[in-house]
UniProtKB/Swiss-Prot annotation:
This is Translation initiation factor IF-3. It is found in: Cytoplasm. It comes from Proteus mirabilis (strain HI4320). Keywords: Cytoplasm, Initiation factor, Protein biosynthesis. Its main location: cytoplasm.
């Protein structure tokens, strides 16, 4: 029969009538090994149990099939995937901007923000921006970056520290220390 359309299944596992093997290695509802049986016999056992016959590993010889509730199997699988996704933490880079003339009060507020970011597990980018005549006093900027590094020594490790000024700013990247 030419030109016939085949419906392509989007499922990862073949179930019931989609299984093409003549013989299968069958596993029961509770995970007990039943052995190698014909496909017809396996389908009958699945029907008796009121469940589906699901092909677990199609590349094995003979293919391994399990009697199970396929809907429940998909639900459990999606649930575990969601749990794994929740556990993955996306590390963000948070930026805090300083100036060479940042006063003590502002410095403490910005330092508190840096501490909060690092405790949350995010990386912190410290940007020190120079304007106008401040460019002539780059050593003040280096002193400030060194002070920040010393104040956050027990919380963070320095990933990149500027040796010289880049354009009109110095950038230091801090990563939280592993506990």
């Amino acid at each position: 029969m030419k030109g016939g359309k085949r419906i392509q299944s989007t499922r990862q596992n073949r179930i019931n009538g989609e299984i093409r093997a003549h013989e299968v290695r069958l596993t029961g509802l509770d995970g007990e090994q039943i052995g190698v049986v014909s496909l017809k016999e396996a389908l009958e056992k699945a029907e008796e149990a009121g469940a589906d016959l699901v092909e677990i590993s199609p590349n094995a010889e003979p293919p391994v099939c399990r009697i199970m509730d396929y809907g429940k199997f998909l639900y459990e699988k999606s649930k575990t995937l969601k749990e794994q996704k929740k556990k993955q933490k996306v590390i963000q880079v948070k930026e805090v901007k300083f100036r060479p003339g940042t006063d003590e009060g502002d410095y403490q507020v910005k330092l508190r923000n840096l501490i909060r970011f690092l405790e949350d597990g995010d990386k912190a980018k410290v940007t020190l921006r120079f304007r106008g005549r401040e460019m002539a006093h780059q050593q003040i900027g280096m002193e400030m970056l060194n002070r920040i590094r010393e104040d956050l020594d027990e919380l963070a490790s320095v990933e990149s520290f500027p040796n010289k000024i880049e354009g009109r700013q110095m950038i230091m990247v801090l990563a939280p220390k592993k506990k």
